[in-house]
Amino acid sequence: MWPQPHLPPHPMMSEKTRQNKLAEAKKKFTDYRQWNIAGVGTRATDTKKKKINNGTNPETTTSEGCHSPEDTQQNRAQLKEEKKASHQHQEALRREIEAQDHTIRILTCQKTELETALYYSQDAARKFEDGNLGTPSSFNLALSQAFRGSPLGCVSTSLIPGESKDLAGRLHHSWHFAGELQRALSAVSTWHKKADRYIEELTKERDALSLELYRNTITNEELKKKNAELQEKLRLAESEKSEIQLNVKELKRKLERAKFLLPQVQTNTLQEEMWRQEEELREQEKKIRKQEEKMWRQEERLREQEGKMREQEEKMRRQEKRLREQEKELREQEKELREQKKLREQEEQMQEQEEKMWEQEEKMREQEEKMWRQEERLWEQEKQMREQEQKMRDQEERMWEQDERLREKEERMREQEKMWEQVEKMREEKKMQEQEKKTRDQEEKMQEEERIREREKKMREEEETMREQEEKMQKQEENMWEQEEKEWQQQRLPEQKEKLWEQEKMQEQEEKIWEQEEKIRDQEEMWGQEKKMWRQEKMREQEDVETGGEAAGAGEADVGAGGEDAGSGAEDVGPGGEDVGAGREAAGEGGENAGAEEDVAAGGEDAGGEEDAGAGEEDMGPGGEDARGGEDAGAGEEDAGGGGDDAGAGGEDAGAGREDAGAGGEDVGAGREDAGAGGEDVGAGGEDVGAGRRRCGSSRGCRNRRRSCGNTRRCRSRRSGAEDVGPEGEDVGAGREAAGEGGENAGAEDVAAGGEDAGEEEDAGGEDAGAAREDAGAGGDDVGAGREDAGAGGEDVGAGGEDAGAGGEDAGAGGEDAGPGGEDAGAGGEDAGPGGEDAGAGGEDAGPGGEDVGPGGEDVGAGGEDVGAGGDAREGGEDTRSEREDAGEAARARGAVLRALPPSLQSSL
């Protein structure tokens, strides 16, 4: 069925209205086309300008490369304005679409009318050709129906059959004209499709260029941020550099002050610290230079990127010019094709416009999504700003902590300087006393100067070796400090790796320290052997003195069977010339030291068990002070035993049970051995065999460095009151300690009847051959691998200058701190008492009158007379102090080096 025609009011009016409507529709379409193209171009340029301004405008970006809250507010306002403009644009597009729909409906109506007219005209032409026209009335009706609303509607209905040829020609011409119009419409539609494709390609290129511009702006912002961060780092590095320079200046000033006060060793350490800090400054300067080079490179990159941005802008301008030219061409072509447009084109265009409207709506949705994403990015940027602020606060807190640490270090340095000043004052006082004694003893020391010179040579050689070892220790300390700095720089690594790395380094350092300690012990063994020989010579000289019956000192001293002096304090002296009185006495036939670290009662035995020689336990001053057990150990008629018994100069009672004192003032038992305050048995040489939980003194096998016990193989507690006495006067009971005929030490090792060790191996020569292979010489003291003596608490107190303090602290080879007040008790004559007196193993000062009590021929009397078994001077002379001072300086240097180490290394060492 054919569609029914629409009947117009009048044929002439319908033609005019149709033409007017077509002209109006074409005008609207061209205007919309031009407006759409111009709007797209302006929008693209606006977006470009906005993006460029967002990336390069200094008003919207801060100096640090991050957005401020004002910028965020401006961005939000711009987004709102853009949303409003987009809504308005959508409303205008909808109105235009409605108008175009109306025009399309009109054109469709006209199309149907033309199709009906063509149908009737073709039908009439067929009938005319066939000759079946019928009656004239029927032919006229067909023509009137065919040409209603058509351009041929003005034809009269009263047609003659002779005029049918003209009418058929006109119909054929109109039909041919309609075909040409259809072809033109199809060509225009194809051309529009090509133009749309070309426009889409151009829009894609424009979008890609806009994306590149946006990315370049983002990269520029990131580079600006990085530049700002690098500038802040440079400022921080410069501030750190200035602080380090100030610290270096302060250290130089301290060095200049310390040149007049401190010894050479500490000046060397301070100079080395200065060198280290200078090296650190140089390294920091190198780092700063590298950072500056990086900044220059980044600036060059920014310049290159700015050039690229300019080139891209030029490309965009060129493309805009091309688009404008193409738009001009399109306008010209549209002007040519306006006359040829018809219904099919408009239908297709309207369909395309509808599709474009859908696409535009989708684009608007995408733009809204982009706006939401931009808002999310702004929130993320705000979060990043907050995180950066927190990081800056953390860095400030760290800087405050570093300042506090530096202040604490300065306070420690000041305290150390004060301690050194006090020590120097004490040394000056001692030197004054020594000078007074030297004036008295110059005549007697002339004979011993040759021996002393030989010893000085040996001591210098040993000092040189010790200095070399100290230099090695300093190098190791430098390596340790460098390692610690590296560890501070690498704190961001996992903690497990750091722990493993630290453990490996500590093991290596411990191995190095063990090797150095073994070397030091070997040297100390050599020194101990030389000391043994020297003691044997002293013993021989003492035997000569005993046969000669020398006189006692100036302070009404008691003289025993061997002619020994008993001092101003009426101390009791054994048959071997040893001091066994109120405090710091020796208790061996060979004059070995039994009082440097523990208290000894009237019989020469150990009266404390595990007593200390520090500043906080017993008082050893000149005024009748306390000596561990509450007894008085002063200068006149004092008590010296554990039970309050008197030990005077005239052979008074010296035992706990009021026993009789023998020729030497001590209690004499069945085997001619001395009996102490606790009733314990003492051998013929006056050695101690009794109570007191003694412990071993060897440090070779003990890896636990707290000195509670030196030898892990043979350390057993000795319980008092259960000892047996053998045929030779030695103890061979439950405690398994023995005192042999040679007067060996019975507190540190087990000794059998022959004087040798009753442990794993026994030698026939009377020396100690225990598990640690220590040798006990004629003096009875423990002479192990490191030539150290064994005190009451298991500490080392021997020739190596080891520590023997109240807390059982570490006793190394460097003369470390031993007392609760920070005083030393090493081999070099360090301070051990509250009054500044010395109580070491090298013949140091221990009494009120400046007397020596050590094993090397010490002074025990009030007048400075010598009573020791191996004394260098007989009446008022002790060993030369130069050797002791040199050894003390070396020991102090070691102690300073160890104290300079961090607490973690001190605990490990």
Swiss-Prot record:
Residues 1-88, 300-362, 381-408, 425-494, 524-909 are annotated as: Disordered. Keywords: Coiled coil. The keyword Coiled coil applies. Residues 746-755 have a biased composition (Low complexity). Disulfide bonds: none annotated. Residues 1-11 have a biased composition (Pro residues). The keyword Coiled coil applies. Residues 13-31, 78-88, 425-478, 524-542, 872-892 have a biased composition (Basic and acidic residues). Residues 53-77 have a biased composition (Polar residues). Residues 692-719 have a biased composition (Basic residues). Residues 641-654, 676-689, 791-871 have a biased composition (Gly residues). Residues 607-620, 757-766 have a biased composition (Acidic residues). Residues 192-526 form a coiled coil. Belongs to the GOLGA6 family. This is Golgin subfamily A member 6-like protein 2. The gene is GOLGA6L2.
